[in-house]
């Protein structure tokens, strides 16, 4: 590509077509910026802006109050002993896997684990044993499956796995497994547990200590109203010296974090939104009520919600047999749903999906959820003769 004036015109400021739409994309509902975060994005957008008064390590910066956020607020919020800011939940998971395990060790993952959990384990050189789920319609994860997996690893390798991970909730069906029971099972075998709370931390109450998780990973851009990439990591006192070990070449830098992580706008939008995030977590019961209301309304229309019932999270998976029938007959094919929703200013169902799809009701409130439900009903009626 020749970098002349003509070719460069495609870059520069780019407008976002979906801005202002009713957004039901699970990836985005929990990451919508607060007004304070939007201001912080501009105020702190210059590269290393937070380093005006840096003494050598990000989490020790007092002005702006990153130190207080990382070492006082986050441990209280996550209910853990020590915390750090990372470049995302996947980076949090990798830091734990890489520090706790050694190449050739084993990790146990749940059958609904996010792809990044697999990739992080692969990058850390770990072998993977998976705990199966029950399949459709519930996709239930039996905590005792962790005992079976741990025993299988021990039999095959001669020692227990270095780590176990549970996804809470999973990103496909929004199921909340019995994480406390899973932690108890893992600890019976002296296997530490990593809770992947990318869709939980910042949306709903989560306590690492109450669950018994040794590590907890959260996503700032997915669930804490922050500009990505940014995440959080909570660690128990027992494992903190291992995960947060210092470099022998630079005494203040932590190896697994490559010294410093989220600098500038990412960490400052996370901090800016934090007061609102703490408050919205207290409203979780209403979010669950809204999700259940929405699911019931959808099922009245013939959609089928898969996963836990009654559902306890905003992320939901639906089968849509009627939409699939329509897609096989109309001119627009499998893209008809995306286009009809776009015409109604609704965004979040991936283009081309009709047979099944997932969505999130988080933060929308009953009024907007009613608009979404009405729109789906209108689309069904539009094609009722097809």
Curated annotation (Swiss-Prot):
InterPro entries: PyrdxlP-dep_Trfase (IPR015424), PyrdxlP-dep_Trfase_major (IPR015421), PyrdxlP-dep_Trfase_small (IPR015422), Sep_Cys-tRNA_synth_arc (IPR013375), SepSecS/SepCysS (IPR008829)
GO MF annotations, alphabetized: Sep-tRNA:Cys-tRNA synthase activity
Top-level taxon in the UniProt lineage: Archaea
Entry keywords, A to Z: Protein biosynthesis, Pyridoxal phosphate, Transferase
Gene Ontology process terms (BP): translation
Residues annotated as transmembrane: none
N6-(pyridoxal phosphate)lysine modified-residue sites: 222
Annotated catalysed reactions: O-phospho-L-seryl-tRNA(Cys) + hydrogen sulfide + H(+) = L-cysteinyl-tRNA(Cys) + phosphate
Broad class of enzyme this protein falls into: transferase
Enzyme Commission no: 2.5.1.73
Record: residues binding pyridoxal 5'-phosphate: 89-90, 196, 219-221
Pfam family, one: SepSecS
Annotated SUPFAM superfamilies: PLP-dependent transferases
Quaternary structure note: Homodimer. Interacts with SepRS.
Family recorded in the similarity comment: Belongs to the SepCysS family.
Role description: Converts O-phospho-L-seryl-tRNA(Cys) (Sep-tRNA(Cys)) to L-cysteinyl-tRNA(Cys) (Cys-tRNA(Cys)).
Protein name, as recorded: O-phospho-L-seryl-tRNA:Cys-tRNA synthase
Species annotation: Methanosarcina barkeri (strain Fusaro / DSM 804)
Lineage summary: Archaea, Methanobacteriati, Methanobacteriota, Stenosarchaea group, Methanomicrobia
């Amino acid at each position: 590509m020749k970098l002349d004036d003509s070719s460069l015109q495609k870059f520069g400021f780019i407008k976002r077509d979906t801005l202002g739409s009713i957004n039901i994309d699970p990836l985005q509902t929990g990451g919508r910026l607060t007004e304070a975060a939007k201001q912080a994005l501009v105020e702190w957008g210059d590269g290393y802006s937070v380093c005006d008064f840096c003494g050598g390590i990000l989490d020790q910066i007092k002005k702006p109050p990153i130190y207080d956020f990382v070492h006082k607020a986050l441990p209280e919020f996550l209910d853990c002993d020590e915390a750090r800011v990372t470049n995302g939940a996947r980076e949090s998971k990798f830091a734990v896997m890489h520090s706790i395990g050694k190449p050739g060790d084993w990790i146990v993952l749940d059958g609904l684990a996010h792809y990044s959990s697999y990739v992080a384990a692969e990058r850390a050189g770990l072998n993977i044993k998976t705990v199966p789920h029950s399949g459709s319609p519930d996709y239930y994860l039996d905590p005792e499956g962790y005992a079976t997996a741990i025993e299988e690893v021990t039999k095959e390798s001669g020692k227990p796995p270095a780590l176990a991970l549970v996804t809470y909730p999973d990103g496909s069906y929004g199921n909340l497994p019995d994480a406390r029971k899973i932690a108890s099972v893992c600890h019976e075998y002296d296997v530490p547990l990593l809770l992947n709370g990318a869709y939980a931390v910042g949306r709903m109450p989560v306590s690492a200590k109450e669950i018994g998780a040794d590590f907890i990973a959260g996503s700032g851009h997915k669930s804490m109203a922050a500009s990505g990439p940014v995440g959080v990591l909570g660690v128990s006192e027992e494992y903190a010296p291992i995960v947060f070990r210092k470099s022998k070449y630079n005494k203040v830098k932590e190896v697994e974090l490559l010294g410093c992580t989220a600098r500038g706008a990412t960490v400052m939008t996370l901090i800016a939104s934090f007061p609102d995030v703490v408050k919205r977590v207290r409203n979780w019961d209403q979010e669950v009520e809204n999700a259940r209301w929405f699911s019931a309304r959808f099922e009245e229309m013939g959609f089928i919600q898969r996963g836990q019932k009654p559902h306890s999270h905003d992320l939901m998976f639906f089968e849509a047999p009627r939409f699939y029938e329509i897609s096989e007959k109309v001119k627009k094919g499998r893209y008809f749903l995306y286009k009809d929703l776009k015409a109604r200013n609704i965004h979040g169902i991936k283009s081309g999906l009709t047979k099944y799809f997932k969505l999130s009701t988080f933060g929308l409130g009953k009024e907007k959820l009613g608009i979404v439900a009405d729109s789906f009903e209108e689309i069904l009626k539009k094609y009722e003769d097809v």
